[in-house]
A protein has these predicted regions:
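Acidic, small-polar-rich N-terminal luminal/periplasmic segments of exported/outer-membrane proteins
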Residues: 1-129, 485
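Outer-membrane beta-barrel translocator/receptor signature
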Residues: 91-94, 104-185, 191-197, 248, ...
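Membrane-embedded beta-barrel scaffold of Gram-negative outer-membrane proteins
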Residues: 255-257, 263-269, 273-281, 452, ...
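Conserved C-terminal beta-signal and adjacent last beta-strands/turns
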Residues: 308, 320, 331-332, 453, ...
Length: 699
């Protein structure tokens, strides 16, 4: 009820009375999950959020209401892009706020565009009583993890603080041939004076994996003919398949309360990240080809090295305050944001020659994969395959007007967004801009009841185009539009939220060409006809529309010893005159979007054993279509986790906490769905039954 969340442009606000849907995960909530990645921790309880990657795959991010948000698009302390590409670290996470829905006007436009959600991480700071905790954990199959959390405050009013966190994990996962080596370090130093608050953060994370990336590609082209999900221990690629992710972030943020009823905040941060290793794209066979004798097999494809670099500079400066015009209150805010991201991708000099065709029905995939050899060259091309810079500048204004003793609140505002994209490889630069408006309202007929609604937009950069005269232009950013209405009610020991939303996102032509510049899918494709009329790749065409209803409830029952939660989302994802990945117009449903997702959890502080807490979590994912015409769908599945936590105190400060859990108790075999651009459908094998045990000692 009293969760204070960071809403970027709107400042810190009460999550219960906010005019948008926002969920806060505090440090204890994240730590108690003991998920190996941040996305797995966040996605396990909210029905409108679905993880992709995480522990199951080295490609990492979240889906909000059916749309994708990559890990590199997460914000840290309000600074965009500071989490790092394919990041999984959580050692520095003090809290995480999920803002659901289109949010460009509130949070600013990501350099590469994002739709339907934002995630902001607040870093850990030293508590008033200090932080002193060490931990040791074991995760199946044979991973050992050590953690340390040391923090202290100094000064007469404890105005100075430092906090350091570390996590090391190494060993074999439950999946055959899949092992990881994870290192995470975080340092925070902060000053909190009467008016000025300043914080410095430094975060380093490196994750090395073997056998950790095995994603089945382009299932939509195989008419959905994918074999049944195997046991989660099964690896679709050999153990020599490897990827490393490394990232370093440094940032400085501040808040200053002036003598004139307004506050100034700002920050600057720099993140450098790298993702490198082998790139292999296993593909299901549609029918008999030179590579496959029948359908329902898959070919591993060949292996090639990839080396991807990301450099992001992020800064912001904002001011907010309050004044009155008669009986009407005004909470105003203004913000300037600037983000510069540089991307470069290098490839190996060539792909390997070895490949293998796998017959899943024969079993013993490891034996079949033995024919697939790591014969790829270990040399990299001297020139980048992708070399680009994206600059995003924006200026935002908003005013929240309070009427009727602030029980009726109307927020109006917008953000002017300027984008500059430079393709260094092609020596092309394009610029564009757009204004993204927002309108929000919240009505509080009583302190425990809130009706709210909003209209917001998300922006994504458009493509650069060069005409026959050599003039380079860039279309205005693509606009996705959201309408949302909801109601929250505090019943005392139970809080409920019901909301309905619609998000409409434009499609755009792929216009794929081969090395000779010819259209990949021939002159009979719908794009070929469009191009003949003067159209071009990247032009907007058709739309995808997600309409849904969410219901969430959580409570504190039995004298706050029983903590249940439940969430349900029903969503339709429709395509209308939407360009497919094969440059054909389609009408139908979007792939990899379960229509129904439900999640429930419970924690019980037992009365018969002081310090003992039992917990359970259930996740249900409805069937999801893997082609737009609904000819094939992955079946629904349910995951069940159970766990326990016991804390024994020794004196005033010392305490030992032992916790453990079994995830995927019934060892459910399932495909974890993922989406690519257009109507591309991907999937990875879900993780098998997993055990873990952890001991933390606080002193």
């Amino acid at each position: 009820m009293l969760d204070r969340v960071n809403l970027s442009l709107l400042g810190r606000a009460n999550a219960f009375t906010a005019p948008i849907t926002v969920v806060n995960y505090d440090e204890n909530r994240i730590n108690n999950k003991q998920a190996r990645t941040l996305v797995d921790a966040v996605a396990s309880t909210d029905a409108s959020v679905m993880a992709f990657g995480g522990e199951s795959n080295t490609l990492t991010g979240l889906y909000f209401r059916g749309f994708q948000l990559d890990a590199r698009q997460f914000s840290v302390n309000g600074l965009a892009g500071m989490y790092g590409t394919q990041g999984t670290a959580d050692v520095h996470v003090g809290s995480a706020q999920l803002i659901k829905g289109a949010s460009t006007a509130v949070t600013g436009m990501d350099p590469e565009g994002a739709v339907s959600g934002a995630l902001n991480i607040e870093t850990k700071k030293a508590s008033d009583d200090g932080n002193r905790k060490v931990g040791l954990a074991w995760f199946s199959d044979s991973r050992v993890q050590t953690t340390a959390d040391i923090g202290q405050r100094f000064g007469e009013s404890k105005q100075f603080g430092i906090r350091a966190n570390a996590k090391l994990r190494h060993g074999d996962t439950p999946r055959d041939g899949y092992k990881e080596d994870d290192k995470e370090f975080a340092f925070n130093a902060d000053y909190r004076g009467e008016k000025l608050r300043v914080a410095f953060d430094s975060v380093y994370a490196k994750r090395k994996t073997h056998g950790g990336r095995a994603r089945m590609q382009d299932i939509q082209n195989a008419a959905g003919k994918l074999f049944a999900a195997p046991d989660g221990k099964t690896n679709l690629l050999p153990a020599w398949n490897w990827q490393n992710t490394v990232g370093q972030t440094n940032m400085l943020t501040f808040e200053y309360d002036t003598d004139h009823s307004f506050q100034i905040t700002g920050g600057i941060g720099y993140n450098k990240a790298r993702y490198y290793g082998t790139l292999i794209s296993p593909t299901i066979c549609r029918n008999a080809t030179t590579a496959c004798t029948t359908a329902n097999q898959y070919t591993t494809g060949t292996a090639r090295l990839t080396d991807q670099y990301f450099r992001t500079l992020s800064m912001n400066l904002s001011a907010r305050g309050e004044f009155y015009t008669g009986p009407v209150s005004h909470n105003w805010s203004t913000a300037f944001d600037r983000i510069i991201r540089q991307r470069a991708t290098y490839r190996g000099t060539a792909a390997g020659r070895s490949t293998a065709t796998i017959y899943p029905e024969r079993g013993n995939l490891a034996g079949q994969l033995a024919a697939f050899k790591p014969d790829y060259p270990n040399r990299m091309e001297s020139n980048a395959n992708l070399d680009a810079r994206i600059k995003v500048n924006s200026l935002a204004l908003s005013d929240t007007l309070g009427f009727l003793d602030n029980t009726l609140r109307l927020t109006v505002g917008g953000r002017f967004q300027h984008v500059e994209y430079t393709d260094k490889k092609a020596n092309e630069t394009g610029k564009s801009h757009r204004i993204s408006p927002m309108l929000m309202a919240a009505w509080l007929p009583s302190p425990d009841l809130v009706f709210y609604g909003n209209y917001m937009q998300d922006l994504e950069p458009a493509d650069i185009k060069t005409d026959d005269d050599g003039n380079t232009t860039m279309a205005k950013p693509r606009v996705s539009r959201q309408f949302e209405f909801g109601v929250r009610k505090n019943w005392g020991d139970v809080v409920t939220t019901l909301s309905a939303f619609q998000i409409k996102r434009p499609g755009y032509w792929r216009g794929q060409t081969n090395a000779n510049g010819r259209l990949t899918y021939g002159n009979n494709s719908d794009f070929a006809k469009y191009k003949a009329q003067g159209g071009a790749a990247g032009d907007e065409q058709g739309f995808e529309r997600n309409r849904g209803v969410e219901f969430n409830v959580y409570g504190n029952l039995m004298n706050k010893t029983l903590h249940p939660s439940f969430g349900l989302m029903y969503m339709r994802s429709d395509l209308r005159k939407y360009p497919s990945s094969r440059d054909m117009l389609i009408n139908g449903v979007q792939v990899a979007s379960p229509r129904v997702i439900a999640k429930a959890g419970i924690e019980w502080d037992t009365p018969f054993a002081q310090g003992l807490t039992l917990n359970a979590n259930v996740q249900y994912y409805g069937k999801s279509y893997q082609d737009s015409q609904k000819k094939y769908a992955f079946p629904s599945y349910t995951l069940v986790d159970i766990g326990a936590r016991y804390t024994k105190k020794f004196g005033e400060r010392n305490a030992l906490t032992v916790s453990g859990a079994v995830e995927n108790v019934f060892n459910k075999h399932y495909w974890q769905v993922q989406r690519g651009q257009y109507d591309r459908s991907f999937a990875v094998v879900g993780m098998p039954r997993t055990f873990w045990l952890k001991a933390d000692y606080s002193f």
